[in-house]
Amino acid sequence: MKQYLDLMKKVLEEGTPKADRTGTGTLSIFGHQMRFNLQDGFPLVTTKRCHLRSIIHELLWFLNGDTNIAYLKENNVSIWDEWADENGDLGPIYGKQWRAWGAADGRKIDQLSNVVNQLKQDPDSRRIIVSAWNVGELDQMALAPCHAFFQFYVADGKLSCQLYQRSCDVFLGLPFNIASYALLVHMMAQQCDLAVGDFVWTGGDTHLYSNHIDQTHLQLSREPRALPKLVIKRKPDSLFDYHFDDFDIEGYDPHPGIKAPIAI
């Protein structure tokens, strides 16, 4: 994960001070790309401990099409608490867009099911895409999608994925995003009888919050360790039938966690 540390260093050295929606202030760069070969290990940051349980539960929650935090709360995951209303609702965020995008004629489009079918029936298609950026529903969302658009690509029997993230909290959010999409690629590859290829991350406004600078310097002082290995213990009947206990991470030996405030 040296390239993640290189990105942190780049933002510190080249970032432009900018105001932001939260009022916190950032150092920001625009446009950056990283490529992770998923056959080299699972890209989980090792220079601080990442809360993998939250990453897995959040992805399963997205895949279920859920937009209420009740499932997350039941599993002691609090990462969406600050944005939920008094009933735990977040509006039509990721899960709704991925699984039930509303078409003008009233249809609900299951983008993820469509992707599975495309990968099995037409893997060379250049249209194997999922979008969470539904312009007509942005004003109903508790938080507009940060990881907004992703595309799958098959070559030589390997499945790759590229994500476009329009806004990226480099210190807190990005390690989650990388691990979450890497996990999704592994799951999708298993369902479609493919090997894993690359996960390509592309960032738009890529920033460090002003109250994360000290934590970033601490993380940069640490040496990366070997990447862990993801083990999926069974093959469910569909992409939507995975459970938390289906996943093991072997050999994860991170440095201690580093606490930092969330910009809301």
Swiss-Prot record:
Query: Which InterPro entries does this chain map to?
Result: Thymidate_synth/dCMP_Mease, Thymidate_synth/dCMP_Mease_dom, Thymidate_synth/dCMP_Mease_sf, Thymidylate_synthase, Thymidylate_synthase_AS
| Primary location group | cytoplasm
**SUPFAM superfamilies per the UniProt record, alphabetical:** Thymidylate synthase/dCMP hydroxymethylase
Catalytic residues of the enzyme:
C146
So, what pathway does this thing act in? Pyrimidine metabolism; dTTP biosynthesis
Q: What's the Enzyme Commission number for this chain?
A: 2.1.1.45
PROSITE patterns, alphabetically? Answer: THYMIDYLATE_SYNTHASE
Name a single GO biological process.
dTMP biosynthetic process
Question: Is this entry keyworded Thylakoid?
Answer: no
Location in the cell reads: Cytoplasm
Function, in words? Catalyzes the reductive methylation of 2'-deoxyuridine-5'-monophosphate (dUMP) to 2'-deoxythymidine-5'-monophosphate (dTMP) while utilizing 5,10-methylenetetrahydrofolate (mTHF) as the methyl donor and reductant in the reaction, yielding dihydrofolate (DHF) as a by-product. This enzymatic reaction provides an intracellular de novo source of dTMP, an essential precursor for DNA biosynthesis.
Q: How does it assemble?
A: Homodimer.
Q: What is this protein called?
A: Thymidylate synthase
Q: What is the lineage of its organism?
A: Bacteria, Pseudomonadati, Pseudomonadota, Gammaproteobacteria, Enterobacterales
Its gene name is thyA
